Amino acid sequence: MTRKMLALLFAFAVGAIVGHVTIPSGTPLVGVAQAQSHKPVFMTRLFTGPDNLTHSEEVGMDFPGGVLKLLPITSGELHLAAPGNVIDWHRAPRRQYVITLVGHAELEVAGGKKINVGPGHVDLVEDVTGKGHITKVVGADERITLQLPLTDQSGK
């Protein structure tokens, strides 16, 4: 694990203790994301629609004043999944952020739509009801995610 990754994990752990996570402007994570893409930074939100199926939308992440305040969280967990691991249709166990730190995955939602996620990708997973989604680890590497459960599980 690189020093930058350890520093990022530490920052999220401190945020979990405080009850929320902030990403300060000017950190290597933000600078790299904006410099390489030349477009705004987004997170993917998975949610259950009125049809009881999971849908996705891209939500822009603006940094007013250099800091993006996320929804309050309760704790943090690191999860490891082996290459080729597939979790068939499943609902999220709770409303949470899922941040891919290492490896790649493909998320499948309603209508066969596939979302590719890799290192640095942020998902806000809220499909706690309905059919759910499929998660498939792709490529030769393990996938490590940081899962941050939201304090408010009501979704209101």
Give the location of each predicted region:
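Bacterial N-terminal signal peptides
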Residues: L8-T27
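Short acidic-glycine-tyrosine-enriched beta hairpin
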Residues: G111-T129
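Conserved short histidine dyad/triad with adjacent acidic residue
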Residues: G60-P64, T74-A92, D127-T129, D152
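Short beta-strand His + acidic residue motifs that chelate non-heme Fe in jelly-roll/DSBH
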Residues: W89, L107-E108, V125-E126, K131-G139
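Short, conserved beta-strand element in jelly-roll/cupin
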Residues: R91-L107
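Short beta-strand segments in beta-sandwich/barrel cores
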Residues: V86-I87, H104-E108, V122, Q153
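A short, N-terminal "cap"/entry segment at the start of jelly-roll beta-barrel domains
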Residues: V21-L80
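A short hydrophobic beta-strand segment most commonly corresponding to one strand
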Residues: L124-V125, G139-G155
